[in-house]
């Protein structure tokens, strides 16, 4: 027991003694009203002093905890900060308004873009792993487009492909809209597109609209992605710088005909 607690205890004991004396006077029917008043005041003062001591002691302990050194509190602060920071990284991509989610009966790997897988992990409350991809031109052309692929249902099979960001790489500048893989839409007409963050653009789940969209993209490919003559072809226009150097070293042109190769 520290000194403050000892003082408070002494005050309480003294007040308790005064209260007992006051009780005895009531039982003996003493006529000394002045003595009764003094004892009652003593009881109140003792209790007030004891309460003041206890309150001051509690306030002093709170001040010490608030003024503790950063070294003493750093483990607690770090442990409380890290989960918040980690949650921020996990939700930053999901909270982005510029993303599209597509569900289909088979995973979409060939969607008209070049991707590089950079991770795969098990997701909580899901028995299927999620794969993470980023644009193959992230370093060469600072394209930050990403996508996630995950199986979400076994029977019937259902896969979710989520796209984040927009492609800015030159290879895909011809694509003005979000690419859709319609290879299995003939057999699975229940596949549908969900798009967020662009209220002025809507995608219908009907097969006819999807076929029209695919035909539109085919025309874009024919117009923008094929050179008119073989001599106009340059590897640096269609692939990363490392691959382009290798192709140029072998003097290879994919648009040469058999006549060009034999001459």
From Swiss-Prot:
Which ranges of the sequence are coiled-coil?
none
- Transmembrane portions of the chain: none
Which subcellular locations apply to this protein? Nucleus
- Per the record, the domain of life is Eukaryota
What SMART domains does UniProt report for this protein, alphabetically? WRKY
Q: Which residues does the annotated region (Disordered) include?
A: 59-104
Q: Which GO terms describe its cellular component?
A: nucleus
Q: Which residues bind DNA?
A: 104-174
Query: Which InterPro entries does the record associate with it?
Result: WRKY_dom, WRKY_dom_sf, WRKY_plant
Looking up PROSITE patterns in the UniProt record yields: WRKY
User: What induces it, per record?
Assistant: By salicylic acid.
The UniProt entry's GO biological process terms, in alphabetical order, are: defense response to bacterium; salicylic acid mediated signaling pathway
- Where is this chain compositionally biased, Low complexity type? 64-74
Q: Name one GO molecular function term.
A: sequence-specific DNA binding
Q: Which UniProt keywords apply?
A: DNA-binding, Nucleus, Transcription, Transcription regulation
Q: Does the keyword field hold Nucleus? A: yes
Q: What does this protein do?
A: Transcription factor. Interacts specifically with the W box (5'-(T)TGAC[CT]-3'), a frequently occurring elicitor-responsive cis-acting element.
**Sequence similarity:** Belongs to the WRKY group III family.
Q: Which protein is depicted?
A: Probable WRKY transcription factor 62
Q: Which gene encodes it?
A: WRKY62
């Amino acid at each position: 027991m520290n000194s403050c607690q000892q003082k408070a205890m002494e005050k309480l004991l003294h007040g308790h003694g005064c209260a007992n004396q006051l009780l005895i006077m009531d039982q003996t029917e003493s006529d000394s009203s002045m003595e009764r008043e003094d004892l009652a005041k003593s009881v109140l003062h003792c209790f007030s002093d004891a309460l003041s001591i206890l309150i001051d002691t509690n306030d002093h302990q709170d001040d010490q905890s608030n003024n503790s050194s950063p070294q003493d509190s750093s483990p607690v602060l770090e442990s409380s900060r890290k989960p918040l920071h980690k949650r921020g990284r996990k939700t930053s991509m999901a909270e982005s308004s510029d993303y599209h989610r597509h569900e289909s009966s088979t995973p979409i790997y060939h969607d008209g873009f070049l991707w590089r897988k950079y991770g795969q992990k098990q997701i909580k409350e899901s028995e299927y792993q999620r794969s993470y991809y980023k644009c193959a031109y992230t370093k060469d052309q600072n394209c930050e487009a990403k996508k996630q692929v995950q199986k979400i249902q076994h029977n019937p099979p259902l896969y979710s492909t989520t796209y984040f960001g927009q492609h800015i790489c030159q290879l895909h500048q011809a694509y003005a809209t979000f690419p859709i893989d319609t290879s299995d839409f003939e057999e699975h007409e229940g596949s549908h597109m969900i798009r967020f963050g662009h209220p002025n653009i809507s995608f219908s789940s009907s097969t006819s609209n999807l076929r029209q969209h695919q035909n539109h993209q085919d025309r874009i490919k024919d117009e923008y992605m094929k050179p008119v003559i073989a001599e106009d072809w340059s590897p640096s226009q269609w692939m990363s710088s490392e691959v382009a150097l290798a192709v140029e070293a072998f003097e290879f042109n994919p648009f040469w005909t058999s006549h060009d190769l034999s001459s």
